[in-house]
Amino acid sequence: MASQTPGTEAQSQTVQPGRIAAISLHTSPLDQPGTGDAGGMNVYIVEVAKRLAERGIAVDIFTRATSFEQPPEVELAPGVTVRNIAAGPYGTLDKTALINYLCPFVHGMLRAEAEHLGGSYDLVHTHYWLSGQAGWPVAREWGVPLVHSMHTMARVKNMSLAEGDTPEPEERVRGEDALVALADRLIANTDDEAAQLINYYGASPSRVSTVFPGVDLTTFTPGSRAESLRRLGLPEDTILLLFVGRVQRLKAPDVLLRAAARLLELNPSLRDRLVVAVVGGQSGTGYREPWLLSDLADSLGIADLVRLEPPCPRAELVHYYRAATVTVVPSHSESFGLVAVESQACGTPVVAARVGGLPTAVRDGVSGVLIDGHDPHDYANVLHRMITEPRWRERMGAAGIHHASGLSWESTVDGLLAAYRDALHQCRLTVPCR
């Protein structure tokens, strides 16, 4: 899945990193996904780091400390260490404020590396633009390649903003432009993201690798729907529409609520069995308090059907997926769509917006349905068919299991290692690195 620079594949196979510095400045890999700024990127970093360590590659993940009670080092897994770097005041800061604390963060990283007895780093992999701003001076100081994953891009997000949402600042756009110029290797989650890097940011195709994210196929598996419904305290005949993710305008949980209200207009007989579950916490602009979503449900006349649930560990989340009739992912922007893949791995079809990486995460018409735009009426029509045509829905569920089986984290790491080897090889040819 990872692209290779022509003519370098054979040579790059002999170069292997022994120790990697990953940077996730604005959100800790120890945070619960679905809360604050923690989401699919956090899952990505943790799952990749664990599997790299299983292959003998040590990974240190640098993040900003948010409490004086946090120790400088936390072992996340054998071979994976989270390093909490003091930079700026403790507590949660808005991402727009973090740019002011890049210098102390960089200083903290350099000091941590200088004091560490385990040897130097072979490569720096940064996640999100803020991490990249801290990562490129560190990589240059150490003389190692910089690999960067955007995860989301300002220009792309600004082209698909939800109504009332705040555009990404020009400062971020300029920062991403700089990273495209400075990084030795850019990792795209999908072919669509790779094209965006090339077309909107002028990235050289030879320095872009497409590596699909994965899913934990040992946790997210098919199981008894009846048992999962019982665990959630729901009757066996429940029609469960599921949303998983941070409660923010970008993720568009309001579209699901409006679609559910429209669904009942189409078929009022569904009301006694319908439940809409929103599993996730507050984040980002808009929806400053979860109760605002409750107000919307009340205004739509479906407050009695909506369950607002806090983010939960994967061992619990899997039961929501198994119990769901369909998982709805109506995002305005999505770099990949991990929730959609997790749902399919559990055998539950997906109805999603045709944006970003979701056409890769969901096989339209096979494992789910992709919808152009965010009109609740369009979602309601598809959901009604999903509910009233169980055989169609079951075929999609089975196809989703097959589709997700090809998106393992092991395959992701295979692709990343190919990109790492290529970056290391190119770096050796052009010492000092770019």
From Swiss-Prot:
Protein name per its UniProtKB record: D-inositol 3-phosphate glycosyltransferase
Catalytic activities: 1D-myo-inositol 3-phosphate + UDP-N-acetyl-alpha-D-glucosamine = 1D-myo-inositol 2-acetamido-2-deoxy-alpha-D-glucopyranoside 3-phosphate + UDP + H(+)
Family matches, as CDD domains: GT4_sucrose_synthase
Binding sites annotated in the UniProt record for 1D-myo-inositol 3-phosphate: H26, D37, A38, G39, G40, M41, N42, K95, Y128, T152, R172
Gene encoding the protein: mshA
UniProt-annotated binding residues for UDP-N-acetyl-alpha-D-glucosamine: Q32, P33, G40, R246, K251, E334, E342
Family per similarity comment: Belongs to the glycosyltransferase group 1 family. MshA subfamily.
Binding residue positions for Mg(2+): Y321, R322, A324, T348
Keywords: Glycosyltransferase, Magnesium, Metal-binding, Transferase
SUPFAM superfamilies tied to this protein: UDP-Glycosyltransferase/glycogen phosphorylase
Function: Catalyzes the transfer of a N-acetyl-glucosamine moiety to 1D-myo-inositol 3-phosphate to produce 1D-myo-inositol 2-acetamido-2-deoxy-glucopyranoside 3-phosphate in the mycothiol biosynthesis pathway.
Natural source organism: Thermobifida fusca (strain YX)
GO molecular function: acetylglucosaminyltransferase activity; D-inositol-3-phosphate glycosyltransferase activity; magnesium ion binding
Pfam families: Glyco_trans_4_4 (PF13579), Glycos_transf_1 (PF00534)
The keyword Metal-binding is annotated on this UniProt entry: yes
Protein EC: 2.4.1.250
UniProt key word Magnesium: yes
GO terms under biological process: mycothiol biosynthetic process
Assembly description: Homodimer.
Cysteines paired by S-S bonds: none
